């Protein structure tokens, strides 16, 4: 995995691990030797319950990063306002170091396929994603990390994933500080191979 740091002011968090439900008991009984934890955002959208209680305890000791799997940034459906409201509320509560999701699509006609479908890296798709990234960042009032998987490059692509993602970052002016999002570090692009 290559991490392309587009910002010199993003603090290095050290080594982290994913916090999954099957690990809750261990997290509560012993504190693993890690510097931060990653949570799947959607697993904590509930308004109460054990997952949030565990995350509260973990967050008291460690920074959290949030990684989503359902933003569907590449979909042609309207952005899911309910999803974004839940994500924004969760971020306000736990103040993650960053929020990430996949550069893909997973919904059509307001139905979720529960998969990460590839985007074609074409001018049309890149322009569409840039507009949606900007809209999401405006709603969340913070910049987001896009997770780009080289294995998920759609048919008819005019660019490879690395170049296409780089174009997207440049066009969305990702990496610039904004008066609208004070104090939030610019986007990091995570590329999985």
Where are these regions (language model features)?
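Alpha-helix boundary/capping motif
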Residues: 148-151, 157-164, 174-181, 185
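Hydrophobic faces of well-ordered beta-strands that scaffold small-molecule active sites
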Residues: 13-19, 35-39, 64-67, 97-101, ...
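Active-site beta-loop-alpha junctions enriched in small/polar residues
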Residues: 20-22, 40-42, 69-72, 102-104, ...
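Boundary/entry segment of secreted carbohydrate-active catalytic domains
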Residues: 2-26
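Acidic (Asp/Glu)-rich catalytic clusters
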Residues: 27-32, 49-66, 82-97, 134-139
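Acidic-and-aromatic substrate-binding clefts and catalytic sites of carbohydrate-active enzymes
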Residues: 41-53, 72-81
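Short, intrinsically disordered C-terminal tails of secreted or membrane-associated proteins
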Residues: 186-192
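Active-site acidic/histidine proton-transfer and metal-coordination neighborhood
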Residues: 80-146, 152
């Amino acid at each position: 995995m290559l991490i392309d740091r587009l910002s010199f002011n993003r603090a290095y968090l050290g080594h982290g691990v994913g916090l999954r439900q099957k690990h809750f008991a261990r997290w509560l009984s012993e504190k693993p030797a890690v510097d931060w934890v990653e949570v799947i955002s959607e697993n904590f959208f509930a308004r109460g319950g054990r997952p949030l209680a565990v995350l509260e305890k973990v967050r008291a000791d460690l920074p959290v990063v949030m990684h989503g799997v359902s933003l569907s940034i590449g979909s042609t459906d309207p952005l899911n306002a309910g999803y974004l409201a839940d994500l924004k509320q969760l971020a306000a509560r736990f103040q993650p170091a960053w929020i990430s999701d996949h550069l893909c699509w997973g919904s059509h006609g307001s139905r979720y396929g529960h998969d990460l479908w590839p985007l074609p890296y074409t001018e049309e798709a890149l322009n569409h994603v840039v507009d949606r990234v900007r809209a999401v960042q405006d709603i969340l009032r913070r910049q987001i990390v896009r997770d780009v998987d080289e294995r998920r490059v759609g048919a008819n692509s005019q660019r490879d994933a690395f170049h296409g993602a780089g174009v997207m970052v440049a066009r969305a002016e990702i990496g610039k500080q904004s008066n609208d999002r004070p104090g939030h570090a610019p986007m990091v692009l995570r590329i999985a191979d």
